Amino acid sequence: MAPAESGVSPRRNPSQLSWMNLSSNLILAYQSFGVVYGDLSTSPLYVFPSTFIGKLHKHHNEDAVFGAFSLIFWTLTLIPLLKYLLVLLSADDNGEGGTFALYSLLCRHAKLSLLPNQQAADEELSAYKFGPSTDTVTSSPFRTFLEKHKRLRTALLLVVLFGAAMVIGDGVLTPALSVLSSLSGLQATEKNVTDGELLVLACVILVGLFALQHCGTHRVAFMFAPIVIIWLISIFFIGLYNIIRWNPKIIHAVSPLYIIKFFRVTGQDGWISLGGVLLSVTGTEAMFANLGHFTSVSIRVAFAVVVYPCLVVQYMGQAAFLSKNLGSIPNSFYDSVPDPVFWPVFVIATLAAIVGSQAVITTTFSIIKQCHALGCFPRIKVVHTSKHIYGQIYIPEINWILMILTLAMAIGFRDTTLIGNAYGIACMVVMFITTFFMALVIVVVWQKSCFLAALFLGTLWIIEGVYLSAALMKVTEGGWVPFVLTFIFMIAMYVWHYGTRRKYSFDLHNKVSLKWLLGLGPSLGIVRVPGIGLVYSELATGVPAIFSHFVTNLPAFHKVVVFVCVKSVPVPHVSPEERFLIGRVCPKPYRMYRCIVRYGYKDIQREDGDFENQLVQSIAEFIQMEASDLQSSASESQSNDGRMAVLSSQKSLSNSILTVSEVEEIDYADPTIQSSKSMTLQSLRSVYEDEYPQGQVRRRHVRFQLTASSGGMGSSVREELMDLIRAKEAGVAYIMGHSYVKSRKSSSWLKKMAIDIGYSFLRKNCRGPAVALNIPHISLIEVGMIYYV
């Protein structure tokens, strides 16, 4: 059989495949400049001024400048080049990077999650099996120790939230620091520009940056990579020019002997200056956090071939210039730029600062969405700004909060050195946390020895600890800002997670017994009404208490009932083919099903608006699959709760016994409106006539029908499918709990503060669950419930 006939594409030779991989990685490497390296590449604007501020001004000499450059060179080599490129980029979660990716890996390979909604079926997800299978992972004593102690698992969650809150702090500090630093060049050439005028211009740029976030960056994203590349090439040649013109001997400073000499001369003052040196690697975490948009090869190529050499040459050239112009340290970058190219470089620097700020803002949105997916952030509005670029999101509430805080930083400090102190602490803390989780991954996921993990952790913590300790010395000089921001965001995230856990625990312990459910019938005055009732809860098993409340207050429920649970699993993405997990709750005559809708922590929830039709198709496929199972007849008379199957609505379109057709129904204007004398109704009539001159309203409606091949199925299966179709035609109602969560009277004062004040405030001021799930308001039934947790 020919390849075309068999459906198998012709095999490509190895040279073709290698060329395709090379070209693909080169394209991704090019695109990564605008997303990953914007922040890191603008560091030369403020590193040397921040390093030589404070007591180090007493050591303004050539040896100190050479030593500072040597420190910057080895910092760039050890942290971005060795730690991130060689080690961390190998620890991805299905291609995703960042602290949450490492935590997700740990949650899959060890039972670290505090929310007990995991199921065995989740482990069958294709993304779940990435890396060593959980079936083959040997239960090490360290892993068992973590799983047994809830306090340790809580501590791990707190560390993750601490890191996430620090990243949010980066989203506040980076725009203020980058924009102010790029604009500082105006004062180098225009002496009459005051600090106040510079601040006003910076605020205008910052307001414009945040105000345009709702438009999405995809319209101008194609410019991001060229801007950063032009910036890197510019600073490379400026650095090369300064080396040749001012002091070619600076090349010798790559030797670590200059670091020893530097500390021997400067002593404690030199150690404190490390808080400025670490600014040379701010933005490095973006190489790992944005891994999901690229490949590890593309990020490695971009950094090793372009970014690293350009930054090293620029810092070397700036140091060569400063060694002969010690008075230019406060504005070292712009003073080192040759006059003929000053204005082009100034424009490119400002644009590069905006690109770097944009990348950090986008990362902040992504981190908050991941926190929300893991149940650690209140429900917020997530707007997807691009139909073509997956994961490009905008969060209005967070955007305006970031803008207000960023403006407060710029106006309050007015000094890039103070903001740099805060920014350096935030970045180094995130790196510190990433190193810690990487060590855990080495033991738990990679199954390497604890000695190797301890060696990795100890080596990097010693290096990073030196920088962090120096940065912490500047807490009183602006360094307190990231801790205040982190404390606020972390408290909000943990309180929300704690309240969510307690609420889930209440639901779990107050599930309705199956015996009660089986006893529902006409003898109790219960009526089954036409339609499908979707009962939403967070329970993945059992019948939620809101259903009993609903039936108690309104003794009727729908002919078809589906208990729906929308939950997140510790993987970045769940494919549409694996999204729906369908099962049966009661014997067949009850027409009760369970649907678990699974999303990854980076997935988009219900964006297509076709949830009802996908659900009906999946249930129909489940009924068909169950009928073909020879063992199903043996268990038909008993409860099938707990038996779940993965169903694909996409697959059912081609193989299902249901056919889907879209019909256009025509509704005519109500005759009561036409004959009424009411002014209001008459105005409505005029609206109808303007929009539909014929008095017709056209509506699209999806209908399901059994295929011709369904005649061979059993009568009971056909009847069940017809009941499902008729119920869908009758309409779909959404039943949700309107919850009031309160602490018990016997609770401690701390718990009362967390639940009655903190969680209650967040719940009242966040989006409702119905809005977050895009549930049509006209079809919503809310059942009031009080949760005493």
UniProtKB/Swiss-Prot annotation:
Cellular component terms per the entry's GO annotation: cytosol; plasma membrane
Induction details: By potassium starvation.
Matches recorded under InterPro entries: K+_transporter (IPR003855), K_trans_C (IPR053952), K_trans_N (IPR053951)
Extracellular side: 54-68, 176-195, 241-270, 322-340, 414-424, 472-478
Membrane topology of the entry: Multi-pass membrane protein
Pfam families from the UniProt entry: K_trans, K_trans_C
Tissues with expression: Detected at very low levels in roots, stems, leaves and flowers of mature plants and strongly expressed in the roots of potassium-starved plants.
Record PANTHER family: K+ POTASSIUM TRANSPORTER (PTHR30540:SF83), OSMOTIC STRESS POTASSIUM TRANSPORTER (PTHR30540)
Protein name: Potassium transporter 4
Source species: Arabidopsis thaliana
Phylogenetic classification of the source organism: Eukaryota, Viridiplantae, Streptophyta, Embryophyta, Tracheophyta
Gene: POT4
